[in-house]
Protein backbone atom coordinates (compact mmCIF):
# COMPACT_ATOMS: atom_id res chain seq x y z
CA UNK A 1 0.00 0.00 0.00
CA UNK A 2 1.23 3.47 -0.85
CA UNK A 3 0.88 6.23 1.74
CA UNK A 4 0.59 9.88 0.76
CA UNK A 5 2.14 12.47 3.07
CA UNK A 6 -0.22 15.42 3.53
CA UNK A 7 0.89 18.67 1.88
CA UNK A 8 1.06 20.59 5.18
CA UNK A 9 3.58 18.02 6.49
CA UNK A 10 5.66 18.38 3.32
CA UNK A 11 5.75 22.13 3.82
CA UNK A 12 6.63 21.75 7.48
CA UNK A 13 9.52 19.43 6.68
CA UNK A 14 11.00 21.70 3.99
CA UNK A 15 13.03 23.99 6.30
CA UNK A 16 14.44 20.95 8.12
CA UNK A 17 15.43 19.27 4.86
CA UNK A 18 16.98 22.51 3.64
CA UNK A 19 19.23 22.64 6.67
CA UNK A 20 20.11 18.96 6.29
CA UNK A 21 21.35 19.45 2.71
CA UNK A 22 23.38 22.51 3.68
CA UNK A 23 21.12 25.30 2.45
CA UNK A 24 20.12 28.15 4.70
CA UNK A 25 16.66 29.38 3.88
CA UNK A 26 16.66 33.11 3.25
CA UNK A 27 20.45 33.36 3.68
CA UNK A 28 21.84 34.52 0.35
CA UNK A 29 25.35 34.90 1.79
CA UNK A 30 25.99 31.21 1.12
CA UNK A 31 25.82 31.90 -2.60
CA UNK A 32 28.00 35.01 -2.67
CA UNK A 33 31.06 34.47 -4.87
CA UNK A 34 34.54 34.68 -3.44
CA UNK A 35 36.93 37.30 -4.84
CA UNK A 36 40.71 37.09 -5.33
CA UNK A 37 42.65 40.02 -6.78
CA UNK A 38 46.19 39.16 -7.88
CA UNK A 39 48.06 42.46 -8.24
CA UNK A 40 51.54 41.83 -9.63
CA UNK A 41 54.41 44.28 -9.07
CA UNK A 42 56.04 45.88 -12.16
CA UNK A 43 54.72 43.44 -14.77
CA UNK A 44 54.58 44.80 -18.32
CA UNK A 45 51.73 44.33 -20.78
CA UNK A 46 53.77 41.84 -22.82
CA UNK A 47 55.41 39.85 -20.03
CA UNK A 48 53.02 36.87 -20.14
CA UNK A 49 52.61 34.61 -23.13
CA UNK A 50 48.85 35.09 -23.52
CA UNK A 51 49.60 38.81 -24.01
CA UNK A 52 52.39 38.27 -26.52
CA UNK A 53 55.57 37.14 -24.76
CA UNK A 54 57.20 34.74 -27.22
CA UNK A 55 60.34 34.16 -25.16
CA UNK A 56 58.94 32.03 -22.35
CA UNK A 57 55.56 30.51 -21.62
CA UNK A 58 53.42 31.30 -18.58
CA UNK A 59 50.97 28.37 -18.77
CA UNK A 60 49.27 28.85 -15.42
CA UNK A 61 48.53 32.54 -15.95
CA UNK A 62 47.50 31.72 -19.53
CA UNK A 63 45.03 29.18 -18.11
CA UNK A 64 43.27 32.01 -16.29
CA UNK A 65 42.72 33.68 -19.68
CA UNK A 66 41.65 30.51 -21.47
CA UNK A 67 39.07 29.96 -18.74
CA UNK A 68 37.93 33.58 -18.58
CA UNK A 69 38.19 36.96 -20.29
CA UNK A 70 41.14 39.21 -21.05
CA UNK A 71 41.04 42.95 -21.73
CA UNK A 72 43.40 44.80 -24.06
CA UNK A 73 42.35 48.30 -22.90
CA UNK A 74 42.89 48.01 -19.17
CA UNK A 75 44.69 50.82 -17.36
CA UNK A 76 46.06 51.40 -13.91
CA UNK A 77 45.63 54.93 -12.54
CA UNK A 78 49.31 55.64 -12.07
CA UNK A 79 52.65 54.44 -13.46
CA UNK A 80 53.99 53.80 -9.96
CA UNK A 81 53.06 51.57 -7.04
CA UNK A 82 51.49 53.59 -4.19
CA UNK A 83 48.93 55.64 -6.16
CA UNK A 84 48.13 52.65 -8.35
CA UNK A 85 47.27 50.61 -5.25
CA UNK A 86 45.28 53.48 -3.72
CA UNK A 87 43.10 53.67 -6.84
CA UNK A 88 42.47 49.93 -6.81
CA UNK A 89 41.49 49.83 -3.15
CA UNK A 90 39.46 53.06 -2.96
CA UNK A 91 37.86 53.28 -6.40
CA UNK A 92 39.00 56.91 -6.61
CA UNK A 93 41.74 58.95 -8.22
CA UNK A 94 44.79 58.72 -5.93
CA UNK A 95 45.36 62.48 -6.17
CA UNK A 96 42.25 62.94 -4.02
CA UNK A 97 44.31 61.49 -1.18
CA UNK A 98 47.49 63.48 -1.96
CA UNK A 99 49.21 60.32 -3.16
CA UNK A 100 50.59 61.00 -6.62
CA UNK A 101 53.87 59.08 -6.39
CA UNK A 102 55.36 56.34 -4.28
CA UNK A 103 55.17 56.79 -0.50
CA UNK A 104 58.74 57.19 0.76
CA UNK A 105 60.28 58.71 3.88
CA UNK A 106 58.44 61.45 5.75
CA UNK A 107 60.93 64.04 4.44
CA UNK A 108 60.52 63.02 0.80
CA UNK A 109 56.75 62.90 1.18
CA UNK A 110 56.69 66.42 2.61
CA UNK A 111 58.90 67.75 -0.19
CA UNK A 112 56.45 66.38 -2.75
CA UNK A 113 53.31 67.50 -0.85
CA UNK A 114 52.47 63.84 -0.33
CA UNK A 115 50.51 62.12 2.41
CA UNK A 116 52.43 59.67 4.57
CA UNK A 117 49.60 57.16 4.36
CA UNK A 118 46.12 56.64 2.97
CA UNK A 119 43.43 58.16 5.19
CA UNK A 120 41.89 55.16 7.05
CA UNK A 121 38.44 56.81 7.12
CA UNK A 122 37.95 56.42 3.36
CA UNK A 123 35.77 53.66 1.98
CA UNK A 124 37.72 50.73 0.58
CA UNK A 125 36.63 47.66 -1.28
CA UNK A 126 37.75 45.62 1.74
CA UNK A 127 35.67 47.59 4.25
CA UNK A 128 32.64 47.46 1.96
CA UNK A 129 32.87 43.70 1.47
CA UNK A 130 33.60 43.12 5.16
CA UNK A 131 30.47 45.06 6.10
CA UNK A 132 28.53 42.79 3.76
CA UNK A 133 29.60 39.54 5.36
CA UNK A 134 32.92 38.80 3.66
CA UNK A 135 36.08 37.55 5.34
CA UNK A 136 38.78 39.94 4.10
CA UNK A 137 42.54 39.46 3.92
CA UNK A 138 45.55 41.21 2.39
CA UNK A 139 48.72 39.25 1.64
CA UNK A 140 51.80 40.86 0.12
CA UNK A 141 52.91 44.33 -0.86
CA UNK A 142 50.97 47.17 0.80
CA UNK A 143 52.77 50.49 0.12
CA UNK A 144 49.90 52.72 1.20
CA UNK A 145 51.64 53.72 4.43
CA UNK A 146 54.44 52.28 6.54
CA UNK A 147 58.08 51.35 6.15
CA UNK A 148 61.25 53.43 6.01
CA UNK A 149 60.82 55.89 8.92
CA UNK A 150 57.01 55.59 9.00
CA UNK A 151 56.03 53.26 11.82
CA UNK A 152 53.23 55.25 13.44
CA UNK A 153 50.72 54.73 10.64
CA UNK A 154 47.39 52.86 10.44
CA UNK A 155 47.53 49.08 10.17
CA UNK A 156 45.94 47.39 7.13
CA UNK A 157 43.23 46.13 9.50
CA UNK A 158 42.03 49.74 9.80
CA UNK A 159 41.14 49.70 6.09
CA UNK A 160 38.76 46.75 6.27
CA UNK A 161 41.16 43.81 6.15
CA UNK A 162 40.53 41.39 9.00
CA UNK A 163 43.87 39.70 8.38
CA UNK A 164 47.02 41.13 6.83
CA UNK A 165 50.53 39.90 6.13
CA UNK A 166 52.51 42.55 4.27
CA UNK A 167 56.10 43.28 3.19
CA UNK A 168 58.62 45.95 4.19
CA UNK A 169 56.42 48.79 2.87
CA UNK A 170 53.76 48.31 5.51
CA UNK A 171 53.31 47.63 9.21
CA UNK A 172 51.73 44.85 11.20
CA UNK A 173 52.56 41.19 10.60
CA UNK A 174 55.00 41.14 7.72
CA UNK A 175 57.54 39.26 5.65
CA UNK A 176 60.99 40.83 5.39
CA UNK A 177 63.79 39.92 3.01
CA UNK A 178 67.26 38.85 4.08
CA UNK A 179 70.11 41.18 3.08
CA UNK A 180 67.72 43.99 2.13
CA UNK A 181 68.13 47.58 3.36
CA UNK A 182 64.43 48.49 3.36
CA UNK A 183 63.61 45.29 5.23
CA UNK A 184 66.22 46.13 7.83
CA UNK A 185 64.65 49.57 8.28
CA UNK A 186 61.21 47.99 8.64
CA UNK A 187 62.41 45.56 11.29
CA UNK A 188 63.13 48.48 13.63
CA UNK A 189 59.55 49.78 13.48
CA UNK A 190 57.98 46.99 15.52
CA UNK A 191 54.18 46.67 15.38
CA UNK A 192 53.69 43.10 14.32
CA UNK A 193 55.18 39.65 13.93
CA UNK A 194 58.13 39.52 11.53
CA UNK A 195 59.10 36.56 9.32
CA UNK A 196 62.46 36.61 7.51
CA UNK A 197 62.99 34.83 4.18
CA UNK A 198 64.78 35.01 0.86
CA UNK A 199 62.97 37.18 -1.66
CA UNK A 200 62.40 34.26 -4.05
CA UNK A 201 60.37 32.54 -1.32
CA UNK A 202 57.97 35.46 -0.86
CA UNK A 203 55.19 34.63 -3.34
CA UNK A 204 54.96 31.07 -2.01
CA UNK A 205 54.76 32.35 1.57
CA UNK A 206 52.05 34.91 0.71
CA UNK A 207 49.97 32.23 -1.03
CA UNK A 208 50.40 29.82 1.88
CA UNK A 209 49.19 32.58 4.23
CA UNK A 210 46.21 33.35 1.99
CA UNK A 211 45.19 29.69 1.81
CA UNK A 212 45.45 29.34 5.59
CA UNK A 213 43.19 32.38 5.91
CA UNK A 214 40.69 30.87 3.48
CA UNK A 215 40.65 27.63 5.46
CA UNK A 216 39.81 29.54 8.65
CA UNK A 217 37.03 31.71 7.21
CA UNK A 218 34.16 29.47 8.25
CA UNK A 219 31.06 29.71 6.08
CA UNK A 220 31.76 33.28 4.97
CA UNK A 221 32.64 34.17 1.38
CA UNK A 222 36.15 35.59 1.18
CA UNK A 223 37.93 38.54 -0.41
CA UNK A 224 41.69 38.18 -0.79
CA UNK A 225 44.11 40.84 -1.98
CA UNK A 226 47.19 38.92 -3.14
CA UNK A 227 50.03 41.31 -3.96
CA UNK A 228 53.36 39.59 -4.70
CA UNK A 229 56.59 41.58 -4.65
CA UNK A 230 57.45 39.78 -7.89
CA UNK A 231 58.36 40.77 -10.56
CA UNK A 232 59.85 43.95 -9.04
CA UNK A 233 63.61 44.20 -9.21
CA UNK A 234 66.14 43.28 -7.98
CA UNK A 235 65.46 39.86 -9.47
CA UNK A 236 66.85 37.27 -7.06
CA UNK A 237 65.57 33.87 -8.22
CA UNK A 238 66.11 30.44 -6.79
CA UNK A 239 69.35 29.17 -8.32
CA UNK A 240 67.66 25.94 -9.42
CA UNK A 241 65.05 27.84 -11.43
CA UNK A 242 67.70 30.16 -12.87
CA UNK A 243 69.58 27.24 -14.44
CA UNK A 244 66.75 26.76 -16.94
CA UNK A 245 67.28 30.20 -18.50
CA UNK A 246 71.06 30.49 -18.74
CA UNK A 247 70.99 29.20 -22.31
CA UNK A 248 67.89 31.19 -23.32
CA UNK A 249 69.54 34.62 -23.41
CA UNK A 250 73.02 36.00 -22.84
CA UNK A 251 71.61 39.01 -20.97
CA UNK A 252 72.18 38.07 -17.31
CA UNK A 253 69.39 40.36 -16.11
CA UNK A 254 66.89 38.74 -18.46
CA UNK A 255 67.96 35.31 -17.20
CA UNK A 256 67.09 36.33 -13.64
CA UNK A 257 63.86 38.03 -14.69
CA UNK A 258 62.63 34.97 -16.61
CA UNK A 259 63.42 32.75 -13.63
CA UNK A 260 61.42 35.01 -11.29
CA UNK A 261 58.54 35.09 -13.81
CA UNK A 262 58.56 31.30 -14.15
CA UNK A 263 58.40 30.81 -10.39
CA UNK A 264 55.57 33.37 -10.13
CA UNK A 265 53.62 31.47 -12.78
CA UNK A 266 54.15 28.20 -10.93
CA UNK A 267 52.88 29.74 -7.69
CA UNK A 268 49.77 31.12 -9.42
CA UNK A 269 49.14 27.61 -10.71
CA UNK A 270 49.47 26.22 -7.18
CA UNK A 271 46.92 28.76 -5.92
CA UNK A 272 44.40 27.81 -8.62
CA UNK A 273 44.90 24.09 -7.96
CA UNK A 274 44.42 24.66 -4.23
CA UNK A 275 41.15 26.53 -4.78
CA UNK A 276 39.98 23.75 -7.07
CA UNK A 277 40.81 21.01 -4.53
CA UNK A 278 38.81 22.92 -1.92
CA UNK A 279 35.80 23.04 -4.25
CA UNK A 280 35.97 26.84 -4.41
CA UNK A 281 37.12 27.53 -7.96
CA UNK A 282 33.74 27.47 -9.70
CA UNK A 283 32.35 30.33 -7.61
CA UNK A 284 35.48 32.44 -7.17
CA UNK A 285 36.12 35.61 -9.17
CA UNK A 286 39.85 35.75 -9.91
CA UNK A 287 41.37 38.98 -11.23
CA UNK A 288 44.95 39.17 -12.51
CA UNK A 289 46.75 42.39 -13.42
CA UNK A 290 49.77 44.57 -12.56
CA UNK A 291 50.32 47.86 -10.74
CA UNK A 292 52.40 49.56 -13.47
CA UNK A 293 54.72 48.88 -16.38
CA UNK A 294 58.11 47.17 -16.31
CA UNK A 295 61.05 48.80 -14.63
CA UNK A 296 63.74 50.98 -16.18
CA UNK A 297 65.77 51.79 -13.10
CA UNK A 298 69.21 53.23 -13.73
CA UNK A 299 70.58 51.99 -10.40
CA UNK A 300 70.23 48.40 -11.64
CA UNK A 301 70.54 48.70 -15.40
CA UNK A 302 73.58 50.67 -16.47
CA UNK A 303 76.78 49.85 -18.26
CA UNK A 304 78.81 49.69 -15.05
CA UNK A 305 76.69 46.83 -13.73
CA UNK A 306 77.05 44.62 -16.81
CA UNK A 307 79.64 41.83 -16.66
CA UNK A 308 82.78 42.85 -18.53
CA UNK A 309 82.47 39.92 -20.92
CA UNK A 310 78.90 40.81 -21.87
CA UNK A 311 78.26 41.96 -25.43
CA UNK A 312 74.79 42.90 -26.52
CA UNK A 313 72.05 45.49 -26.40
CA UNK A 314 71.80 47.30 -23.08
CA UNK A 315 68.19 47.07 -21.96
CA UNK A 316 66.35 46.13 -18.76
CA UNK A 317 64.08 43.07 -18.62
CA UNK A 318 60.31 43.24 -18.93
CA UNK A 319 58.19 43.80 -22.04
CA UNK A 320 55.52 46.35 -22.87
CA UNK A 321 54.03 44.49 -25.82
CA UNK A 322 55.08 47.20 -28.26
CA UNK A 323 53.73 50.11 -26.23
CA UNK A 324 56.02 53.11 -25.73
CA UNK A 325 57.34 53.99 -22.28
CA UNK A 326 57.78 52.01 -19.10
CA UNK A 327 57.27 52.41 -15.36
CA UNK A 328 57.28 56.07 -14.17
CA UNK A 329 55.87 57.18 -17.55
CA UNK A 330 52.36 58.15 -18.64
CA UNK A 331 52.95 56.71 -22.08
CA UNK A 332 51.02 53.48 -22.69
CA UNK A 333 53.88 51.22 -21.62
CA UNK A 334 53.71 52.65 -18.11
CA UNK A 335 49.95 52.44 -17.52
CA UNK A 336 48.34 49.89 -19.89
CA UNK A 337 48.41 46.51 -18.21
CA UNK A 338 47.49 42.90 -18.93
CA UNK A 339 44.13 42.10 -17.37
CA UNK A 340 42.37 38.77 -16.89
CA UNK A 341 39.19 37.86 -15.03
CA UNK A 342 38.10 34.28 -14.45
CA UNK A 343 34.77 33.21 -12.98
CA UNK A 344 34.01 29.69 -14.12
CA UNK A 345 30.30 29.75 -13.38
CA UNK A 346 29.65 33.06 -15.18
CA UNK A 347 32.32 34.14 -17.69
CA UNK A 348 32.57 32.39 -21.09
CA UNK A 349 35.92 30.73 -21.68
CA UNK A 350 38.60 32.30 -23.90
CA UNK A 351 36.78 35.64 -24.17
CA UNK A 352 38.48 38.89 -25.12
CA UNK A 353 37.35 42.53 -24.94
CA UNK A 354 39.22 45.07 -27.07
CA UNK A 355 36.47 47.70 -26.88
CA UNK A 356 35.87 48.52 -23.21
CA UNK A 357 38.27 50.94 -21.52
CA UNK A 358 38.52 49.80 -17.91
CA UNK A 359 40.71 51.15 -15.11
CA UNK A 360 41.82 49.82 -11.74
CA UNK A 361 39.51 52.22 -9.90
CA UNK A 362 36.55 50.71 -11.82
CA UNK A 363 37.10 47.37 -10.10
CA UNK A 364 35.63 48.47 -6.74
CA UNK A 365 32.14 49.30 -8.07
CA UNK A 366 32.26 46.55 -10.69
CA UNK A 367 33.06 43.79 -8.20
CA UNK A 368 30.32 45.03 -5.87
CA UNK A 369 27.86 44.92 -8.75
CA UNK A 370 28.94 41.41 -9.77
CA UNK A 371 28.45 40.03 -6.25
CA UNK A 372 25.21 41.92 -5.63
CA UNK A 373 26.05 44.49 -2.97
CA UNK A 374 25.81 48.27 -2.93
CA UNK A 375 28.91 50.41 -3.26
CA UNK A 376 29.56 54.01 -2.15
CA UNK A 377 28.22 56.63 -4.55
CA UNK A 378 31.17 59.01 -4.28
CA UNK A 379 33.59 56.86 -6.28
CA UNK A 380 35.43 58.00 -9.39
CA UNK A 381 35.39 54.44 -10.67
CA UNK A 382 32.50 53.33 -12.87
CA UNK A 383 30.58 50.05 -12.76
CA UNK A 384 31.87 48.10 -15.79
CA UNK A 385 30.53 44.74 -14.62
CA UNK A 386 28.69 44.04 -17.90
CA UNK A 387 31.98 44.11 -19.78
CA UNK A 388 33.39 41.39 -17.52
CA UNK A 389 30.43 39.18 -18.43
CA UNK A 390 31.08 39.59 -22.15
CA UNK A 391 29.15 42.75 -23.06
CA UNK A 392 31.62 45.44 -24.26
CA UNK A 393 31.05 49.00 -23.07
CA UNK A 394 31.77 52.20 -25.00
CA UNK A 395 33.26 54.71 -22.57
CA UNK A 396 31.22 57.86 -21.97
CA UNK A 397 33.73 59.54 -19.70
CA UNK A 398 37.43 60.35 -20.06
CA UNK A 399 40.14 58.84 -17.87
CA UNK A 400 42.85 61.11 -16.44
CA UNK A 401 46.27 60.69 -14.85
CA UNK A 402 48.86 62.67 -12.95
CA UNK A 403 52.29 61.40 -12.07
CA UNK A 404 54.31 63.00 -9.31
CA UNK A 405 53.46 66.65 -8.97
CA UNK A 406 56.07 68.67 -7.14
CA UNK A 407 54.36 72.01 -6.47
CA UNK A 408 57.52 73.32 -4.84
CA UNK A 409 59.60 72.55 -7.91
CA UNK A 410 60.47 74.62 -10.92
CA UNK A 411 59.76 74.29 -14.61
CA UNK A 412 62.74 73.32 -16.70
CA UNK A 413 62.72 75.22 -20.01
CA UNK A 414 61.54 72.90 -22.74
CA UNK A 415 61.22 69.98 -20.35
CA UNK A 416 58.71 68.29 -18.10
CA UNK A 417 57.57 69.69 -14.79
CA UNK A 418 60.30 69.01 -12.27
CA UNK A 419 59.40 65.87 -10.39
CA UNK A 420 62.34 65.94 -8.03
CA UNK A 421 62.06 63.39 -5.27
CA UNK A 422 60.39 60.86 -7.55
CA UNK A 423 61.78 58.45 -10.09
CA UNK A 424 62.09 58.70 -13.86
CA UNK A 425 62.99 56.03 -16.42
CA UNK A 426 66.66 55.68 -17.26
CA UNK A 427 65.73 56.07 -20.94
CA UNK A 428 65.08 59.81 -21.24
CA UNK A 429 62.77 59.36 -24.23
CA UNK A 430 60.30 57.73 -21.83
CA UNK A 431 60.08 60.90 -19.67
CA UNK A 432 56.47 61.91 -20.25
CA UNK A 433 54.56 65.08 -19.39
CA UNK A 434 53.03 64.80 -15.93
CA UNK A 435 49.34 64.86 -16.98
CA UNK A 436 47.42 62.64 -19.40
CA UNK A 437 43.83 62.12 -20.51
CA UNK A 438 42.23 59.47 -22.70
CA UNK A 439 38.82 60.10 -24.25
CA UNK A 440 37.74 57.47 -26.77
CA UNK A 441 40.60 56.87 -29.19
CA UNK A 442 42.31 60.16 -28.34
CA UNK A 443 45.02 60.62 -25.75
CA UNK A 444 46.63 63.91 -24.75
CA UNK A 445 49.76 64.30 -22.62
CA UNK A 446 50.62 67.74 -21.29
CA UNK A 447 52.50 69.38 -18.44
CA UNK A 448 50.67 71.31 -15.77
CA UNK A 449 52.25 74.53 -17.08
CA UNK A 450 50.60 73.70 -20.46
CA UNK A 451 53.88 72.83 -22.21
CA UNK A 452 54.77 69.61 -23.98
CA UNK A 453 51.48 68.91 -25.78
CA UNK A 454 51.35 65.43 -27.31
CA UNK A 455 48.21 64.08 -28.98
CA UNK A 456 47.83 60.52 -30.22
CA UNK A 457 45.05 58.51 -31.84
CA UNK A 458 45.49 55.20 -30.05
CA UNK A 459 43.30 53.30 -32.48
CA UNK A 460 45.58 54.18 -35.39
CA UNK A 461 48.79 54.66 -33.42
CA UNK A 462 48.90 52.53 -30.25
CA UNK A 463 52.68 52.95 -30.10
CA UNK A 464 52.34 56.74 -29.71
CA UNK A 465 54.71 57.52 -32.57
CA UNK A 466 52.82 60.29 -34.41
CA UNK A 467 52.14 63.48 -32.43
CA UNK A 468 49.02 65.11 -33.93
CA UNK A 469 48.91 68.11 -31.56
CA UNK A 470 49.75 70.63 -34.30
CA UNK A 471 47.10 69.40 -36.75
CA UNK A 472 44.25 68.62 -34.32
CA UNK A 473 44.09 71.81 -32.27
CA UNK A 474 40.36 71.56 -31.50
CA UNK A 475 40.81 68.13 -29.94
CA UNK A 476 43.87 69.36 -28.05
CA UNK A 477 41.89 72.28 -26.60
CA UNK A 478 38.95 70.06 -25.60
CA UNK A 479 41.13 67.51 -23.82
CA UNK A 480 43.43 70.13 -22.32
CA UNK A 481 40.51 72.00 -20.78
CA UNK A 482 39.13 68.79 -19.29
CA UNK A 483 42.38 67.55 -17.77
CA UNK A 484 43.33 70.96 -16.33
CA UNK A 485 39.85 71.39 -14.84
CA UNK A 486 40.18 67.93 -13.30
CA UNK A 487 43.66 68.72 -11.98
CA UNK A 488 42.44 71.95 -10.34
CA UNK A 489 39.75 69.97 -8.51
CA UNK A 490 42.39 67.96 -6.65
CA UNK A 491 43.53 68.93 -3.12
CA UNK A 492 47.16 69.71 -4.03
CA UNK A 493 47.09 73.20 -5.55
CA UNK A 494 48.92 74.12 -8.73
CA UNK A 495 51.48 76.85 -7.95
CA UNK A 496 50.17 80.25 -9.02
CA UNK A 497 53.31 81.01 -11.02
CA UNK A 498 52.55 78.21 -13.49
CA UNK A 499 48.76 78.37 -13.76
Feature roles, as predicted:
Residues 2-4, 10-12, 21-454, 458, ...:
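Formylglycine-dependent sulfatase
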Amino acid sequence: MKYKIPLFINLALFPILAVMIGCKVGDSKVFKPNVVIIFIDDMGYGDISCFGDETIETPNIDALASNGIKFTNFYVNSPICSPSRVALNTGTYPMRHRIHSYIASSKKNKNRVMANYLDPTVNTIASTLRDNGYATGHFGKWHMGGGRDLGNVPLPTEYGFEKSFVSFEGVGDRLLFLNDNLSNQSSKLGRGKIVWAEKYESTRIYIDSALAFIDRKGDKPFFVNLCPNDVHDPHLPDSKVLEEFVSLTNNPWEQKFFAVLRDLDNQIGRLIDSLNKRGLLDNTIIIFTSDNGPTDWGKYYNIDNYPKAYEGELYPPGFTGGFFGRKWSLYEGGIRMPFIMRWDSKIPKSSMDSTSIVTAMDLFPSICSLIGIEYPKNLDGIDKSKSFLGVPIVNKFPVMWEYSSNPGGSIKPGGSWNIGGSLKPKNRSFHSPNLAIRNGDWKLLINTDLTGEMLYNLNNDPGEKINLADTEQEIVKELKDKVIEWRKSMPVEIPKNIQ
